Amino acid sequence: MTSWDFFDTLMGRAAGHEPWRVFETVGGAAYVPIRQEAERRSDRTWDGIFDQVREITGWTAARVEQLKRDEWAAEVAGAFPIAENVTRVRPGDRIVSDTYFSTLQVRELADRIGIPKTVQIVTSWDAKWSGQWWKSEAARQADLHVGDNQRSDWEQPRAAGLRAERYAAGRPTSQETAWERDGFWEVAGAARAARLMNPHPRGSDEHRWWDGAAAANVPFLLLAAALVHEYAFTARPSRLAFVSRDSILLSKVYHALYREPVTIFDASRQTLRNPSADFLAYVKRLAPGTLFVDLHGTGKSVREFTRKTGIELAYVFVCGQRRLAAHAPALATLRGIGTGTAVEVMNYHDEGRVTDVDREGRPIRAPLEYDPAPVRVHRTASIDGARLCCRPPRGVTAEHVIRAAEAVAKAVPRELLRQHQVEHRG
């Protein structure tokens, strides 16, 4: 039988490694020191903490009860499995956690991340930290204890003569720390969540692909979505249409962050440069009041479409190589064409290029021209991580998006980059 620490060993928080970020999510920055002081003054129980919140603040019982409900809802919503450890848990194992949550609360969180119901749960305020638990007969029933805390999960059990394994991968990476240092703790938390949810065996191609998307594409998509939202707030379009194929992941992240309706514009360089009658009819139906959002480009195809048809589209690129004409600006001007190519490749879709649309506006596609395996891994990692983002990033600038795009260029699989076709670069 193995005993397991729970927080940051089996379950992660979307808000990040520091649990007080949940307090900020619930009540704002000013609430954090109140909540922390209440915990210090309390009897170290969940109910006792909120009794102290009311004592400190003088707030009404109804207001404090709402904060309590909101904090628990945030904990549940932000819980994710640390995959490489959860897959090791067996039905007869035991969870031992120093926490202010009750055993029933930890059970609810454990259920959410897929822990078997037959796993026993033991909770206390500091029995592991103080060493009291490790002196018990129950602790000696375990062949091994696994946890992330240097003292509680490593030093204390070993001092009691028990086998222990310290889990260190839950600590933030240097990239995650850099985003948090720049004020984007919600981005760092989402990237960390994606990284720790990696379901693939270490050393496999799938693990590498997932890891790259978690580290680089999750921050890029979150920051890009925030920049698009700011632009759209100023432009005030009736709707946003994200351009197929490379912007489909961005559309999903945008919707997850802002809960605003989005649509997909099924188009390609081919359809814009040589539009059929059906494609023209499709564009005319879609264009009024629509802002078209493309992930990366030079604007050549859009300008050629306007020249040939006289139809001017309200078009914006997230990333470009230079300042474009007023009808097709780029929100972030990249420092090199290779970075833009990498962004496209990391955000490939697993359906073929649009060659035309039918009379109903349904896409007609060419066969898929690249390996779908890494594409599908990138998609799942990117969406799973981005959906766990606690709140939309704030204060995003073009430079932040450029920095994130440059990280994508370093992380994109070289085997997929080699498959990038010439027609994708126009």
Give names to the regions the model predicted.
Residues 130-153, 288-293:
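Conserved Lys-Pro-Asp/Glu-containing loop-to-beta segment of HAD-superfamily phosphomonoesterases
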Residues 60-111, 120-124, 239-246:
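Substrate-recognition element of Asp-dependent hydrolases with the DxDx(T/V) motif
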Residues 257-282:
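Long, charge-dense
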Residues 1-36:
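Active-site neighborhood of HAD-like aspartate-dependent phosphohydrolases
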Residues 23-71:
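A metal-dependent, Asp-based hydrolase signature
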Residues 146, 151-179, 313-314:
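Acidic, Mg2+-coordinating phosphoryl-transfer loop and its flanking beta/alpha structural elements
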Residues 214-217, 273-426:
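Long, contiguous domain-sized segments
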Residues 6-7, 99, 147-148, 243-246, ...:
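Structural motif
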